[in-house]
């Protein structure tokens, strides 16, 4: 798998640190509720956005998400899917196998997955709101891809950066990635120092004082 310098740096961080950097910059991006649906590894990559919606007609349609998987030509993609319906799956093991074959790094679903053992068995990471067994067929369709979407309250654009780990999922606007990473690295370094200070016996009240966090900006 090829890894450019930006993704390498992002992979060296965690969602907590990236979320903190976005907070300092006054930017949205951190989400709540999009967690690993099996004990999968952290993923970092670029967003391929997919909008789903209810199926209203009776005519057969191309299966949701499959056209996006077929179009992938690089190995930095994470599928970012929104428009799911409570209790209805918008991901399953056949899609996971197809995505794995295309070198896609994982899926983040503002919705539910089924067949999670199938994704786990091929080490395909899936992050989302929960699990179900109910099929999307004749219930959900793909209505758009490659367009801005809203995921857990955050607007995500095609090619934005994604990091997801056990604490959840964070999106970073592509135009801000360099600034966010630079600040996140400073935060990580400062927080490592704060942990060491506590372990060395310094007062946690002093170590965690707001003024210490404000100093990270400088």
Q: Where do the language-model regions lie?
A:
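Feature captures the catalytic cores and cofactor-binding loops of soluble hydro-lyases/lyases
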Residues: 1-158, 172-202, 209-218
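C-terminal binding/interaction regions
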Residues: 162
């Amino acid at each position: 798998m090829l890894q450019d310098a930006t993704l390498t740096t992002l992979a060296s961080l965690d969602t907590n640190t990236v979320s903190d950097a976005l907070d300092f910059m006054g930017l949205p991006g951190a989400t709540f509720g999009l967690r690993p649906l099996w004990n999968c590894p952290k993923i970092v990559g670029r967003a391929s956005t997919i909008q789903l919606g209810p199926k209203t007609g009776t005519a057969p349609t191309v299966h949701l998400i499959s056209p996006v998987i077929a179009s992938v030509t690089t190995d930095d993609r994470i599928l970012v899917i929104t428009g799911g319906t409570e209790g209805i799956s918008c991901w399953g093991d056949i899609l996971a196998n197809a995505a794995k074959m295309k070198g896609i790094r994982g899926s983040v679903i503002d919705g539910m997955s089924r067949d999670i053992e199938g994704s786990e068995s091929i080490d395909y990471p899936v992050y989302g709101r929960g699990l179900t067994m109910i099929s999307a067929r004749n219930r959900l369709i793909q209505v758009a891809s490659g367009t801005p979407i809203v995921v857990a309250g955050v607007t995500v654009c095609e090619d934005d950066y994604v990091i997801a780990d056990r604490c959840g999922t964070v999106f970073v606007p592509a135009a801000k990635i360099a600034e966010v990473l630079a600040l996140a690295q400073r935060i990580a370094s400062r927080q490592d120092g704060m942990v060491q200070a506590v372990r060395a016996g310094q007062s946690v009240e002093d170590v965690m004082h707001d003024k210490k966090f404000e100093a990270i900006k400088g």
